[in-house]
Design a protein with these regions (language model features):
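Hydrophobic alpha-helical segments
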Residues: 1-188
Length: 188
């Protein structure tokens, strides 16, 4: 059952078209991603999600590759095909030395790709916090100290956790709207 229609540029209100223009300009893309077009019926919802995406995923101190790997891990573990596809493609584009097998191993916690040593630690911690939020209450798990030990500042820890929060929200949204993916992942 299709739960959402995508609002194409030519069918969008002038306010949504302005947001689409900003999105395409910021992302350097000639098109708007489907999950954003699914929100094209409501400029307030679109602007809210776009602002979160821009501030959390596109901008910031944390390397884009690490953010995409976190988003991929949360999405694949959660079983979200749209976000797995989107972030898998993004990660492979950011680091052409990575393979689909590397990403699959990463989702199982066994990645041997040539990543900075802090990346797998951050990916595991943030994905656990995102997928099992009550786990942060465990008195034996001091995830902040673990991240600091890997060289992350308090500001970077906040940003990492924000990526985790964003991933949960986007997985829920794209599943609820049944957003069609731009291209399958792994690539066919």
């Amino acid at each position: 059952m299709k739960r959402s229609t995508l609002v194409e540029y030519e069918d969008a209100s002038s306010e949504v078209q302005l947001l689409y223009d900003e999105i395409m300009d910021t992302m350097g893309s000639p098109k708007v991603l489907n999950f954003l077009k699914a929100l094209g019926h409501n400029p307030h919802a679109l602007r809210g999600v776009w602002t979160m995406l821009k501030e959390t995923v596109i901008e910031g101190e944390i390397p884009a590759l690490l953010k995409q790997l976190i988003l991929f891990k949360v999405s694949i573990v959660a079983g979200n095909r749209y976000c797995t596809s989107l972030h898998g493609h993004a990660a492979l584009n950011l680091d052409p030395t990575l393979t689909y097998d590397d990403l699959e191993a990463l989702s199982g916690g066994t990645c041997t790709a040539n990543l900075p040593p802090s990346f797998p630690v951050a990916i595991e911690i943030v994905s656990r916090a995102a997928l099992e939020p009550k786990s942060v209450e465990d008195p034996d798990w001091d995830f902040e100290d673990q991240l600091r030990d890997e060289g992350f500042s308090d500001s970077e820890i906040d940003e990492l956790l924000a990526v985790g929060f964003f991933s949960v929200m986007m997985n829920m949204m794209t599943d609820t709207y049944d957003v069609p993916w731009e291209s399958p992942f792994p690539p066919e």
